[in-house]
Amino acid sequence: MNLCLIDPFKQSDVPETVEYYLVDPKNIKSNCASFNRRGTLLAVGCASPIGKILVWDFDTKKIVRTLYHHTGCVNSISWSRNGKKLLTASNDGSLVLWDLATSKILYSLELESPILFAEFHPRNNDLCLIVLQKGTDPILLNFKSSEKTPLNIKSLVTSYIKREENSTGVIPTSVNSNYNGVATFASFNRRGEKIFFGDSCGMISVLDFKSMTIDRQFKVASSNTTVKQIEFSRNHRFMLVSSSDKVLRLISLESTNLYQQMREYQDSVNRMHWKKCCFSSNNEYVVGGMNHKSIHSIFIWSVSGSLVKDLEGPKEGLVDVVWHPLRPIIVSISFTGVIYVWTAYFEENWSSFAPDFQELEENLDYVEDEDEFDAKDSDNENQEVNNNNNNNIGRNPYKKIKTQQELNDKNSEEEEFVDVDHNDRITEFSSDEEEDLFCFSAIDDRYVSNVKFDDPRHPLYEKYQKDKEDSSSTTSNSTISSSSSPSPSSSSTTTTTTTSQKKDETQKKEKSTKKERNSDSKKRK
């Protein structure tokens, strides 16, 4: 796609349609997905019986890595901050740390309970947080020392209350002294400064990572509600909580130690549970994937609370949904394991590329008149102009009527005289017309002055001989024609010859007369 042709005023930052989909070559179902920090790679965990991991190049849509180790369904995938390591967790209780450059296993751990969620520490790739099946405490794992630290919320709350009571003499009100909840979910915030725990009592517990103490607890739902997922926005301002009461809650993190609920999002029509939730890359939208076996529905709300888009996919359930880190793209996984890529619809504006290009809102079929393209003479055209000017009712609005001036110009063009006998001299030529030029070689003056035309060395010798032959043939032809049929010119020549003969005879007679006279005079004497 050419970005120069996209109208900047109509660009949408919300996905609207499925552009393409990704399928495992061996038709193994996908179960979870995660982008790296830049969104160039997409890691996909597959379901049973082969819990392999596929790493897709999101630009070329090709598989660049295939990792095998798990025997159960892969439930969670987490990228390191530098994008060189991958952390995967499975239903079989295995946790694996991968080196993507070599496809080798850097660390592996086998637990007795299925692992539901695992993620890297946002600032330290040597630490990770593990969430196990309900009833088991979350674990903080150090890869270097292999130290596993269980995080029991009840014991942490009790120790915090005792410490505060001993130091101040007052029981702190920021925590519940009668807390009996069980952790169901845990996650680092964006900076890794705190760990947020969700439990089975609809409460969120905040653990300070440095002091490893619970310093805050707040309720988000009723006591019999389970917190299923916690997500954080990229700008560190909001937290999104998904619970079992079919409601997504937006909580503000701007105030220190004051977590205020801002919005609630739910499907008021179907009243379905939410399978997954996330934030958009620009922190302006909240996404919720519906948990239904035959409906692939994704709701997009603005942070202000209004519903922006309801994306309807194929008639199959949704397993996971993630938003691209930088672009308006959503990746969703269906029950059949197909990965759908949702993108925004960009409307290309060709008028910005070609200013003289006119855009049409709709296509119009033009129907011409029966005699529109018939050949007509000037009289008929003049009559047509008069008729059209007098009555324009019922005419085709797309047909252009010729004016009298246009008809006169057309007639003048037809009557224009074109001289084909004489060609104007071309004063200049381009390089493409050099083949049309004719060049003559100059004649040396010495040949003209010293050499005669009948000399073969003369450059015009051949032309001279040819002209001579032509003249001789012309003379012979004229002689033959004069002898065969006399003409007025021949008669005049004969008359001139006769007159000259008479004159000569007269002169001879005069001479003879003079001689006789002289002889007579001599005799007399």
Curated annotation (Swiss-Prot):
It is found in: Nucleus. Residues 462-471, 501-525 have a biased composition (Basic and acidic residues). WD repeats lie at residues 25-66, 69-108, 222-261, 267-312, 313-352. It comes from the Eukaryota. It comes from Dictyostelium discoideum (Social amoeba). Coiled coil: none annotated. Pfam families: ANAPC4_WD40 (PF12894), WD40 (PF00400). The gene is rbbE. This is Retinoblastoma-binding-like protein E. One of its GO terms (cellular component) is nucleus. Residues 371-398, 462-525 are annotated as: Disordered. Residues 383-392, 472-500 have a biased composition (Low complexity).
